[in-house]
C-alpha cells in the first residue's frame, strides 16, 4: 500500500482533486486532540492500494504559536508526524510563483514529492503557458498537468504515485556565508540531539523561520534564544532567498500573454469593491438570492406540495379508511408519516434554489469579495472581517459555520464567530419562512424573507459587539484574503454542488421530521385519561394540554390560547428547525380536520393534475412577482381549505406571523448547533448562547408585536416594551459586570 499526503494552498483545487482520486471511498473523522476534520480516501490501481490523506490548505509550513489556526498547525505537524510514502503538492497553475513557496518547504523534508499542476485550462485561458517538462527538470520531481474539475490528467497522476520512491533534494538557496553557517550549526545541534539528518535539515529551517511549535519545547526555546542572539533576521533572509530562487524558476518555465480575464476582473472589481457602491451591491446580491429562492424555487413548491399530499396524506388516509382502520391509525399514518414526508419534500424547490445561488456566488469568485467588503464595516466595530466567511456558510447550516471558525487565527476571533453564527438564517429556517410567506405574505414575500435574513445578520453583529465590549475584549486580527479572478462556473458543477447539499439537507430533515410527526400524531390521539381520541381533534389530548400550559408565556408576542400548535412548534424546533414546519403541518391538519376532509373527497388523478397544473400557473405569475411584487397575485382562494388557511385564522394576522418568525429566527437553531458550540468553545459559552438567544428572541418578538398593536392597547404595549427593554439591559449588565467572565484562558477548557 502507498500512503500519500495531499497538500496545497487554499483554493488550489485540492478538495476537487481528492474527490476525483477517491470518488466515494472516503472517511471523515477528526485529527487527534482537536476538532479539525480529517479526510482520508483510497483507490485501487490494478492490485495496488493507494491511500490519500487530505491535509488542510496552508500557505506555509511554519507553525508560529501566535496567530496560527488549528488547520495550519495540523498541516505543519502532519508532514512530520504521519507515516507516508510521498506527498502530492497541488499547485494552481494560474499562480505558480506564489504556490511554489510551499513546494520549496516541502522539498526540505527529503520525501518523494509529486507536483499536481492544477487548473491548466484556466491558466491557458488567461494567457499563461507553462513548460511542464522544464519545470520538472528544474524541480527534480514529477510534474503532472491536470484539470481536476474535468478529471483530465488524473490517470497520469495516479500512475506517478506508483513510481514516487525518488527522494527530493532541497532547492539551492543563495544565502550569505554567515546565515548558512548559523543554519549548519542549528542542524548539527539537532543531529547531536538524536534527530535524523533529513529531519535535522528541515527542523533547522523551520526554527530559523520562527517556528515555535516544532520539536521538544525546552530544546526548541533554547535554540530560538541563541538565534535571537545572532542578530541575523534569518526568517527574512530565508524568505527572500526562496522567492529569488522561485522567481528564477518561474522566469524560465512560464510565459504570460495578455490576459483578458485579468482586465475584466480589474474592471469589475472597480465597481464591486468601490468605496461607496460595494455595500449596496453586496446587499443587492443577498436580496437577489432570496428573490431567486422564494420566487423561482417557490414556483415549483405547489407541485411538490400537492403531489405528495395527494399520495402520502390523502391517499394513505383514503386507503386506510377503505380498510376500516381505527382513527388513531389513520392519524399516525396519514397525518404523521404522510405529513412528515409531504413536509420534507415540499422544502426541496426553495432550498435547492438557495443552494444553487450560493454555489453560483462561491464559484464565480464573488463570495471572497463579499468577505472583503464586509470586513471594513465589521472592523469598524472591532469585529473580525474574516469571520464573515464562516457566517456565510451559516446560510446553509449553522453547524458547519461554527466548525469553519476553527480556520481563524486568533482564539478571540474564533470565539466571537462561534457566538455570532447561530443568528445566521440556515436553510431549515428558510423552509419555515417559505410556509409563512405563502400563508400571510402572498405579495412581496421575498421582501419579508430578506428582512429576516438582514435582522439575523444585524443581531449577529450586535452580539459580537457586546462580547467585544465585555468578555472577549481585544483587537480584530487583519484580514488576509486571496481574491480569485472572476470566471463563469459550469452548470454541471453548480448542479452537482447543489445536489450534494440538497441530499444532505433532505436526509437530515426527513429522519427528524417524520419520527417527530409520528410522535406528535400519537400524542394528539391519546387523551389525558389514557384513552384514544376519535378522528376529530379535541382539546383533551396530551399534546393539546401540554401546548395550552405553555402558550400563555407567548401571549405578549401574539400567540393566543387557541394557537397552541404554534407553541408546540417552537418546542420541537429546539431539536431541529426542520421539525417546526412538520409540527405545524401535522397539528393544524389534525386540529382543522384536514385529514378527514381530504380522505372523504379523495381524487388521486385530480390531485396529480392539479400538481402539474400549478407549475405553468406559478411561472406565468413570475414576471409580476419579480418586477412588481407589491401587485403580485393574492393568495389562492382555496387557501382556507388547507393548513395554510387554518394557520391564517389562528395567528393574529401578518403582524402575529412576523413576530413568530422573529422568534424562530433568533432563538437557538437546534441542539446540534448547541453541541458544536460546546465542542468548539466550552460549556459556559454554550449556555450563554442559549440564554442570550432566548432573551433577544423573546424581547424582539414582544417589542415588535406590541409596537405594531400599540394603538389597540397603548398602556399594555408600553408596559411590555419597557419590561423587555429592562430585561435586555439587565442581561447586558450581567455580561458586563459578571465576576465569572469568560476570559480566553477558560475558552479552551472543554469542560
Swiss-Prot record:
GTP 1 binds at residues 8-15. It comes from the Bacteria. InterPro entries: Fe2_transport_prot-B, Fe2_transport_prot_B_C, FeoB_GTPase, G_FEOB_dom, Gate_dom, GTP-bd, P-loop_NTPase. It is a multi-pass membrane protein. One of its GO terms (cellular component) is plasma membrane. SUPFAM superfamilies: P-loop containing nucleoside triphosphate hydrolases. The chain crosses the membrane at residues 276-296, 341-361, 385-405, 422-442, 447-467, 512-532, 657-677, 685-705, 715-735. Keywords: Cell inner membrane, Cell membrane, GTP-binding, Ion transport, Iron, Iron transport, Membrane, Nucleotide-binding, Transmembrane, Transmembrane helix, Transport. Gene3D superfamilies: 1.10.287.1770, P-loop containing nucleotide triphosphate hydrolases. Residues 1-167 form the FeoB-type G domain. One of its GO terms (molecular function) is GTP binding. GTP 2 binds at residues 33-37. GTP 3 binds at residues 54-57. Its main location: membrane. PROSITE patterns: G_FEOB. GTP binds at residues 118-121, 147-149. It holds the Pfam family FeoB_N. It is found in: Cell inner membrane. NCBIfam families: feoB, PRK09554.1. Belongs to the TRAFAC class TrmE-Era-EngA-EngB-Septin-like GTPase superfamily. FeoB GTPase (TC 9.A.8) family. Probable transporter of a GTP-driven Fe(2+) uptake system. This is Fe(2+) transporter FeoB. It comes from Legionella pneumophila subsp. pneumophila (strain Philadelphia 1 / ATCC 33152 / DSM 7513). The lineage of its organism: Bacteria, Pseudomonadati, Pseudomonadota, Gammaproteobacteria, Legionellales.
Amino acid at each position: 500500500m502507498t500512503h500519500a499526503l495531499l497538500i496545497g494552498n487554499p483554493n488550489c483545487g485540492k478538495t476537487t482533486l481528492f474527490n476525483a482520486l477517491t470518488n466515494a471511498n472516503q472517511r471523515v473523522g477528526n485529527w487527534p486532540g482537536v476538532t479539525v476534520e480529517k479526510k482520508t480516501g483510497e483507490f485501487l490501481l490494478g492490485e495496488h492500494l493507494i491511500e490519500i490523506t487530505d491535509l488542510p490548505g496552508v500557505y506555509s509550513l511554519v507553525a508560529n504559536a501566535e496567530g496560527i489556526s488549528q488547520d495550519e498547525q495540523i498541516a505543519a505537524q502532519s508532514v512530520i508526524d504521519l507515516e507516508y510514502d510521498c506527498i502530492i503538492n497541488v499547485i494552481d497553475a494560474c499562480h505558480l510563483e506564489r504556490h511554489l513557496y510551499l513546494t520549496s518547504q516541502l522539498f526540505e523534508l527529503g520525501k518523494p514529492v509529486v507536483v499536481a499542476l492544477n487548473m491548466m485550462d484556466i491558466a491557458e485561458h488567461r494567457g499563461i503557458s507553462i513548460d511542464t517538462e522544464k519545470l520538472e527538470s528544474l524541480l527534480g520531481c514529477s510534474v503532472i498537468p491536470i484539470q481536476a474539475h474535468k478529471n483530465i490528467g488524473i490517470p497520469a497522476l495516479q500512475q506517478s504515485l506508483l513510481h514516487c520512491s525518488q527522494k527530493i533534494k532541497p532547492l539551492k538557496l543563495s544565502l550569505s556565508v554567515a546565515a548558512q553557517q548559523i543554519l549548519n550549526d542549528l542542524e548539527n545541534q539537532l543531529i547531536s540531539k538524536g534527530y535524523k539528518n533529513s529531519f535535522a535539515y528541515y527542523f533547522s529551517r523551520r526554527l530559523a523561520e520562527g517556528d515555535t511549535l516544532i520539536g521538544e519545547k525546552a530544546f526548541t526555546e533554547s535554540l530560538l534564544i541563541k538565534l535571537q542572539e545572532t542578530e541575523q533576521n534569518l526568517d527574512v533572509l530565508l524568505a527572500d532567498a526562496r522567492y529569488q530562487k522561485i522567481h528564477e524558476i518561474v522566469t524560465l518555465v512560464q510565459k504570460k500573454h495578455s490576459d483578458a480575464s485579468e482586465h475584466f476582473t480589474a474592471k469589475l472589481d472597480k465597481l464591486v469593491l468601490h468605496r461607496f457602491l460595494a455595500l449596496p451591491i453586496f446587499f443587492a446580491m443577498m436580496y437577489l438570492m432570496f428573490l431567486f429562492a422564494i420566487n423561482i424555487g417557490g414556483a415549483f413548491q405547489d407541485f411538490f406540495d400537492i403531489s405528495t399530499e395527494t399520495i402520502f396524506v390523502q391517499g394513505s388516509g383514503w386507503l386506510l379508511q377503505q380498510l376500516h382502520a381505527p382513527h388513531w391509525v389513520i392519524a399516525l399514518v396519514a397525518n404523521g408519516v404522510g405529513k412528515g414526508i409531504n413536509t420534507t419534500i415540499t422544502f426541496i424547490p426553495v432550498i435547492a434554489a438557495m443552494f444553487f445561488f450560493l454555489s453560483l456566488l462561491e464559484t464565480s469568485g464573488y463570495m471572497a469579495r463579499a468577505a472583503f467588503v464586509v470586513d471594513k464595516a465589521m472592523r469598524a466595530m472591532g469585529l473580525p472581517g474574516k469571520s464573515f466567511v464562516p457566517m456565510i456558510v451559516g446560510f446553509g447550516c449553522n453547524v458547519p459555520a461554527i466548525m469553519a471558525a476553527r480556520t481563524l487565527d486568533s482564539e478571540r476571533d474564533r470565539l466571537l464567530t462561534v457566538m455570532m453564527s447561530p443568528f445566521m438564517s440556515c436553510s431549515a429556517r428558510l423552509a419555515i419562512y417559505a410556509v409563512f410567506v405563502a400563508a400571510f405574505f402572498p405579495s412581496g414575500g421575498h421582501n419579508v424573507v430578506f428582512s429576516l435574513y438582514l435582522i439575523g445578520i444585524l443581531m449577529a453583529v450586535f452580539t459580537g459587539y457586546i462580547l467585544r465590549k465585555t468578555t472577549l475584549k481585544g483587537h480584530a486580527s487583519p484580514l488576509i484574503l486571496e481574491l480569485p479572478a472572476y470566471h463563469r462556473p459550469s452548470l454541471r458543477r453548480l448542479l452537482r454542488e447543489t445536489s450534494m447539499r440538497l441530499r444532505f439537507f433532505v436526509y437530515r430533515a426527513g429522519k427528524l421530521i417524520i419520527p417527530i410527526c409520528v410522535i406528535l400524531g400519537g400524542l394528539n390521539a391519546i387523551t389525558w385519561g389514557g384513552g384514544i381520541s376519535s378522528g376529530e381533534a379535541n382539546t383533551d389530548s396530551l399534546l393539546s394540554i401540554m401546548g395550552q400550559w405553555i402558550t400563555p408565556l407567548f401571549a405578549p408576542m401574539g400567540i393566543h390560547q387557541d394557537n397552541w400548535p404554534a407553541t408546540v412548534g417552537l418546542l420541537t424546533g429546539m431539536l431541529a428547525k426542520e421539525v417546526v414546519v412538520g409540527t405545524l403541518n401535522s397539528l393544524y391538519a389534525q386540529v382543522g380536520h384536514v385529514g378527514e376532509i381530504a380522505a372523504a373527497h379523495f381524487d388521486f388523478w385530480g390531485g396529480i393534475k392539479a400538481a402539474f397544473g400549478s407549475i405553468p400557473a406559478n411561472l406565468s405569475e413570475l414576471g409580476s412577482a419579480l418586477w412588481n411584487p407589491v401587485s403580485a397575485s393574492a393568495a389562492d382562494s382555496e387557501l382556507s381549505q388547507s393548513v395554510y388557511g387554518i394557520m391564517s385564522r389562528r395567528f393574529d394576522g401578518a403582524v402575529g406571523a412576523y413576530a413568530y418568525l422573529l422568534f424562530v429566527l433568533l432563538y437557538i437553531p437546534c441542539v446540534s448547533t448547541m453541541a458544536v458550540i460546546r465542542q468548539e468553545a466550552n460549556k459556559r459559552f454554550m449556555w450563554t448562547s442559549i440564554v442570550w438567544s432566548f432573551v433577544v428572541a423573546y424581547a424582539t418578538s414582544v417589542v415588535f408585536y406590541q409596537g405594531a398593536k400599540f394603538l389597540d392597547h397603548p398602556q399594555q404595549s408600553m408596559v411590555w416594551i419597557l419590561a423587555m427593554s429592562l430585561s435586555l439591559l439587565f442581561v447586558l449588565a450581567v455580561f458586563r459586570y459578571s465576576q465569572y467572565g469568560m476570559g480566553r484562558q477558560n475558552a479552551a477548557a472543554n469542560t
